[in-house]
Structures are given as structure tokens and as C-alpha cells.
């Protein structure tokens, strides 16, 4: 293994289909996705797309609790999303009360996670503004979002 200690060179998730539960090891974070220490943006996006293809009510247990900061970034990436604003406000309240924001579910992630919404006009417009031109593909949108998230304060 190379890269940072504790990070594998594959993007994976474990799925217990009969119970509708996913234990996410690397690709997904509630409202976001992990950094790319190894592998490629294409591999991470493919992994996230497999996760997003699961049934709406599939529960996702993420390995890390970064929901509030991820949703702060998501709001910057898609500022016009009312659903995202509601989710973010709820996550802030939950965190302040000491309540975990995970598990989440696939429907919520599809509706509010910018890394699963690279084909949405609002996300593409934000990325176009950052690039100074429209992104040419879903993978370019995803890659720019992930690079921006790395720098986001």
C-alpha cells in the first residue's frame, strides 16, 4: 500500500443486500466523498455510481462523521438547493445535540450529495464558473469538485 497510512488503493463498499444496509469503507461520506490518495477519479466516481444505484431506502453507514462540513461544501457547490439547505440545517442541529448524522440513505445522498449530482445543472454551472468554461464531461465535473473540496475551508 502506498499513500497515506490507513487508506487503501481501492474504493470499496460492503453491501448486505438482504437487509438493505451498506457499510461504506472509503468512497462515501454523508453528503460528500473521500479524498483520492490512490486510484483515479474515474475509479472513485464508478464506485460512487454503484453505491447510488442501490435502492432508495438502503442505509449507508459511513466510516467517518464529516456530514456538517461536507454539507457546507455541498451548499457552496449547489447554493440554490432547498433540499440541501434543509438537510444541512438538520445536520447542524443533530451535531449540536450530540446525535450522529449517520446512517443516511441512498435517496438522501442522491438528492443532496454533490458528488452524486455531477450531471445536475446547478453543479455543472458552479464548476463552469470555477473552470472559466463548461466542464466537458461528468468526470471533469467530478474531478473539479473533488479538487475544490480538497481546498475548501
Set out the residue ranges of the language-model regions.
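Catalytic core of the metallo-beta-lactamase
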Residues: 1-78, 146-149
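Accessory terminal helices/loops
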Residues: 46-59, 68-153
Amino acid at each position: 500500500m502506498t499513500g497515506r497510512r490507513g487508506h487503501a488503493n481501492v474504493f470499496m463498499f460492503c453491501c448486505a443486500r438482504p437487509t438493505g444496509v451498506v457499510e461504506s469503507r472509503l468512497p462515501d461520506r454523508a453528503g460528500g466523498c473521500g479524498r483520492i490518495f490512490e486510484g483515479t477519479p474515474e475509479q472513485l466516481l464508478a464506485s460512487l455510481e454503484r453505491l447510488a444505484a442501490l435502492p432508495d431506502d438502503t442505509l449507508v453507514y459511513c466510516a467517518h462523521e464529516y456530514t456538517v462540513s461536507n454539507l457546507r461544501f455541498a451548499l457552496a457547490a449547489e447554493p440554490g438547493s432547498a433540499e440541501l439547505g434543509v438537510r444541512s440545517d438538520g445536520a447542524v442541529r443533530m451535531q449540536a445535540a450530540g446525535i450522529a448524522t449517520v446512517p443516511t440513505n441512498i435517496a438522501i445522498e442522491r438528492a443532496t450529495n454533490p458528488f452524486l449530482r455531477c450531471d445536475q445543472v446547478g453543479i455543472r454551472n458552479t464548476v463552469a464558473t470555477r473552470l472559466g468554461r463548461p466542464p466537458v464531461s461528468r468526470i471533469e465535473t467530478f474531478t473539479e469538485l473533488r479538487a475544490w473540496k480538497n481546498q475548501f475551508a
